[in-house]
Amino acid sequence: MKKILIINANYYNDITQNLVKASTTFCKKRKISLSIINVPGVFEIPICIRKNVKKFDGFIALGCVIKGQTPHFDLICNSSFNAIMNLSITFNKPIGNGIITALNRKQALERSGKLKSNKINKGFEAAKAVISILENGTKKI
């Protein structure tokens, strides 16, 4: 049985809980063994993956960054996304990126699937991507 670690940056907990719910539901339907670790913010996701890289077959990174008035948004997004990509390539492990980057709270809620008018859920999409890679494209999802 494949083992996946979900790392949830819970700074915007009301948004990310919907991502966690969608990704765990999808993984359980696929009979994937899951563990979840909560971290304070998106910037802490890469180190959490690195510390656990030998224990799991794949990872799902979940979080939310909402643009403010300073360059902080760009710095956090760029450094975190680059670190996650480098970990995936270096250790040959799939990492589904379900980190929402939004210009405002409404966009973040839409991308988390929390608004009934929108069926997009980045947690679901990240889980689907990781499982697709783990199954090596042999099964249709």
Where do the language-model regions lie?
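Glycine-rich phosphate/diphosphate-binding loop of Rossmann-like nucleotide-binding domains
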Residues: 1-36
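Short, ordered loop/turn segments at secondary-structure junctions
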Residues: 10-11, 39, 64-65, 100-104
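Active-site rim loops that border cofactor/substrate pockets in soluble metabolic enzymes
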Residues: 24-55
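Generic secondary-structure signature for well-ordered alpha-helical cores
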Residues: 28-32, 54, 85, 89-90, ...
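Short beta-strand segments at enzyme active-site cores
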Residues: 36, 58-62, 94-100
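Glycine-rich phosphate-binding loop
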Residues: 47-84
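Short, acidic/small-residue loops that bind anionic groups at enzyme active sites
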Residues: 74-102, 120-121
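A charged, well-structured terminal subsegment
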Residues: 116-141
